Regions:
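Non-catalytic helical/linker scaffolds that mediate oligomerization, partner binding
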Residues: 1-238
Length: 238
């Protein structure tokens, strides 16, 4: 039996029954629904199409609901974006401000409490990198630009060395999880897993709802590697 599975993420260009059928016949084993994008009606249409194809073709293509997880983003920047120069000092703050080369905001209020001197902040999928020089523990973080470039509004912010204290399931994730459970999906993917407790909590929510979906831990942060064996023990897939 083939143990390696092909997981395909479904988007607007691949959500029709005709295209999904071609993908299934080409070897797709798991249909991934990315809850970072798309409305529930879009995901529901894909679910209906996959289940219809399973009936028609006598197959069992699984459905994976991939939860977005906590998303930290930059706030509003000057209209054309700003250029951060290497070795320059920039302030990251939690109070809203129209960002420029010297200061910009983020949407996570506890960050000044979470970060420590020497830790890195990655902006826009790692295109830009900052190093924390100091934090006031309240509203502002002073950083040095390690890798510069253009920065615009609403870009993703990641913290490879920082233990973020925000919950693993956001309010949006809770709503998406309820929808996925209602649709009886086969798998639930949890983003930015940090500990086995994240997976235990997710499984508890699933079982409490009377569902039997299996869980996948997405390993995206170095701190997860510190307890990877425990995470594996509480997961059905990695």
């Amino acid at each position: 039996m083939k143990r390696t599975k092909i997981v395909a993420t479904i988007g607007p260009s691949s959500s029709s029954k005709e295209v999904l059928k071609d993908m299934v016949l080409a070897g797709m084993n798991v249909c991934r629904l990315n809850f970072s994008h798309g409305a529930y009606e879009d995901h529901l249409e894909v679910i209906k199409n996959i289940r219809s194809l399973n009936d028609e073709l006598g197959l069992n293509v699984a459905i994976l609901a991939d939860l977005q997880g906590p998303k930290i983003r930059t706030g509003e920047m000057q209209k054309s974006g700003v250029h951060l120069e290497v070795n320059e000092i920039v302030t990251v703050q939690t109070d809203n401000v129209v960002g420029n080369e010297k200061v910009f905001s983020i949407n996570y209020l506890r960050l000044p409490k979470d970060v420590n001197k020497g830790e890195l902040i990655l902006l826009d999928d790692g295109k830009l990198m900052l190093e924390v020089i100091k934090t006031d523990g309240k509203k502002q973080i002073t950083c040095k630009v390690i890798q510069g470039g253009e920065l615009s509004s609403n870009k993703g912010v990641n913290f490879p060395n920082t233990k973020i204290s925000m919950p693993s399931l956001t309010e949006k994730d809770e709503q998406d999880l309820s929808f996925a459970i209602e649709q009886d999906v086969d798998w639930i993917g949890l983003s930015f897993v940090r500990s086995a407790r994240d997976m235990i909590d997710l499984k508890h929510k699933i079982s409490s709802a009377g569902a039997k979906a299996k869980v996948i831990a997405k390993i995206e942060k170095p701190e997860a590697l510190e307890c990877i064996d425990d995470i594996i023990n509480e997961s059905d897939g990695i």
